[in-house]
């Protein structure tokens, strides 16, 4: 499989649209977690003007340049919804502008690699606060297969995520069933001391049983 090397800055561009007309309000304000997802903001928004806030439109990325005290991860997310969010003007918002060469979903897969977190931390600079700047982001080398191959990787990745989420939902359902069964037993069965159902096993006995 042939790979072509690019500087990431050749494939992405900053997005600096602001909420000048106050079209978006407090419910649209988002933060970003180190799990690389958008979350509800934890900031106190009382009296804060939302005009300087950046728009994160569908398929846009946003990240926080400060990497210190982040658990060795960079705070970055990809808006995969059909909604527009707004984020603090201290964030950097960008999108893929060479969609003929790079799929945004493939780029987000790349960002989710532990190697990218290590790279961004290693290339962060500063004294009081270390930052991974936009210039540092753009200077990063990335090797890409064809768009068709990228799409295949994305499809496999999404299928794996769907399987994982289905498995986790199954565990949640099983837990609910077990909890309901135990609660039902508590109501129907008399309480007993468990002493007659258990016994202490010494180390010697354990070895003998093994």
Residue ranges of predicted features:
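Non-catalytic DNA-recognition/assembly elements of restriction-modification systems
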Residues: 1-19, 141-203
């Amino acid at each position: 499989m042939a790979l072509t090397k690019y500087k990431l800055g050749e494939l992405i561009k900053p997005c600096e649209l602001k909420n000048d007309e106050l079209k978006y309000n407090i419910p649209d304000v988002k933060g970003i977690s180190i799990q690389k997802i958008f979350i509800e903001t934890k900031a106190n928004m009382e009296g804060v003007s939302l005009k300087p806030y950046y728009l994160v439109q569908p398929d846009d990325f946003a990240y926080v340049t400060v990497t210190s005290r982040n658990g060795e991860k960079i705070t970055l997310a990809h808006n995969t919804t059909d909604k527009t969010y707004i984020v603090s003007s201290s964030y950097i918002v960008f999108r893929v502008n060479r969609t003929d060469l790079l799929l945004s979903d493939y780029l987000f897969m790349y960002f989710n690699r532990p190697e990218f977190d290590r790279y961004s931390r290693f290339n962060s600079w500063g004294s009081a606060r270390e930052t991974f700047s936009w210039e540092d982001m753009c200077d990063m080398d990335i090797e890409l297969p064809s768009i068709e191959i990228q799409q295949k990787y994305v499809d496999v990745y999404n299928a794996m995520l769907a399987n994982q989420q289905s498995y986790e939902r199954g565990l949640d359902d099983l837990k609910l069933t077990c909890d309901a069964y135990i609660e039902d037993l508590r109501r129907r069965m008399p309480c007993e001391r468990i002493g007659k159902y258990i016994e202490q096993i010494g180390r010697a006995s354990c070895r003998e049983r093994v």
